[in-house]
Amino acid sequence: MKILLFGEFSGLHNNLKDGLIKLGHEVVIASGKDGFKDIGNDINLDPIFSGFIGKIESRLKPFYKLPKLIGFDVVQIINPFYPNSKFFPKEFFYFLLRTLNKKFFILGAGSDAFFWKYGKKTMRYSPFKEWLKYDIKKDSYYMQSKKSFNYNNRILKTSNGVIPVMYEYESCYQSSSKCLNTIPLPVNLESIEYRKNIIRNKIVIFHGLNRYGFKGTK
């Protein structure tokens, strides 16, 4: 199959691509480089310019690259709110991706309106309060709005399904008939050199540097 993976969060689609290629599929990633992580892709959606010109470019580039994003058997988007650019016509763009390709799936990953609405109800522990307090320093977030939820729901209903990457997202989408089986986060073990743990007098825990409120590090 010819597969398009649209968007990227922390190498998720890159690891998935490795596995799909090994299974014999043709895979293309169209995304930005996820900020400081500088993650690779096949079609780069990051702007070349900075400032105001860069903001305009970031909103036009997905449409400019559209001829390279059509004719796929399967399209999977990393999140219905990707790219997270104000005034980018996401709903129209995803309509084009659905229309010009065969199947269209959403990944249940990152933050979306379903996660914000149902996460507080279904999970005993959640990062929402800390995200508001420490990361954006506001009392509310736009994904809590009815407008965001209705948009999220429209994208869901017109898709072939949502694929959660862990139980938290499954619990938030489980009321929808579009919720498919959870497929855990992919990891390419062949790219990781195994080194035996050396146990000394203390335990060292690695916790990646990212978003203090949401993930607990800064």
What are these regions (language model features)?
Residues I48-L66:
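Glycine-rich, highly charged phosphate/nucleotide-binding loops
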Residues M1-D38, D42, T99:
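N-terminal subdomain of nucleotide-sugar transferases
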Residues Y64, F92-T99, R124, F128-G161:
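Membrane-proximal helix-turn-helix segments that form the acceptor-binding/catalytic region
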Residues G11-N15, Y212-K218:
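A conserved mid-protein helix/loop that constitutes part of the nucleotide-sugar donor-binding site
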Residues K2-G7, K65-P89, K103-L107:
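Short N-terminal targeting/anchoring amphipathic segment
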Residues V74-Q76, F95-D135, L180-T182:
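Active-site proximal beta-strand in glycosyltransferases
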Residues F115-W116, S140-T182, L189:
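A short, active-site helix/loop in glycosyltransferases that binds the activated sugar's phosphate group
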Residues N181-K215:
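Conserved donor-binding/catalytic core segment of Leloir-type glycosyltransferases
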